[in-house]
């Protein structure tokens, strides 16, 4: 698993500051990125080369997730692993279920559920994250995943996936959104 730090700075860093960040990165093995302005200004400081994708693994499911430093992920690996294990235990998937994962993000629960069900459809507002779900599905050789871009704070009534019969529903929303979608 890769650890990365994004250093948000509003003023130009001095050569000494940059050297300290590089020293920290080398001594810890972290990837260090600088962000002088908005999210589109994030650039890697160290290591100077290598893959741009970061990874985390959930060995219990045989999964490796690839993500960009600016993607949202669960930051506490131990809590994330425990949360996924508990969710899959509660879902008790037997391999024949159709699962709908709302607010799927990069596919944290989507991929885990796909290892234990017939089909999973993830729904997420961010096109980047939908792309990441599909990318991670291919990376992990999972062919039973679909992902849809949709803003779940809007009415789902006209969406074809909302009219289908689902055996299991996963809802892992951001701070807002669950109330609206579950009321429908």
Outline where the language-model segments fall.
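Accessory RNA-recognition modules of RNA-modification enzymes
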Residues: 1-171, 176-184
């Amino acid at each position: 698993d890769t650890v990365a730090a994004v250093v948000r700075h509003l003023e130009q860093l001095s050569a000494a500051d940059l050297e300290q960040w590089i020293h920290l990165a080398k001594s810890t093995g972290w990837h260090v990125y600088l962000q002088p302005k908005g999210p589109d200004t994030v650039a890697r400081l160290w290591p100077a080369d290598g893959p741009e994708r970061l990874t985390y693994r959930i060995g219990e499911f045989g999964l490796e997730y690839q993500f960009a430093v600016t993607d949202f992920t669960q930051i506490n690996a131990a809590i994330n692993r425990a949360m996924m294990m508990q969710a899959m235990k509660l879902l008790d998937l037997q391999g024949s279920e159709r699962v709908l994962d709302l607010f799927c993000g990069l596919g944290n629960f989507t991929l885990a559920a796909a290892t234990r069900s017939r089909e999973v459809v993830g729904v997420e507002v961010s096109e980047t994250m939908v792309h990441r779900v599909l990318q991670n599905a291919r990376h992990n050789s999972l062919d039973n995943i679909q992902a849809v871009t949709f803003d779940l704070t809007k009415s789902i009534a006209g969406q074809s996936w909302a009219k289908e019969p689902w055996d299991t529903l996963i809802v892992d929303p951001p701070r807002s959104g669950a109330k609206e979608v579950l009321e429908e």
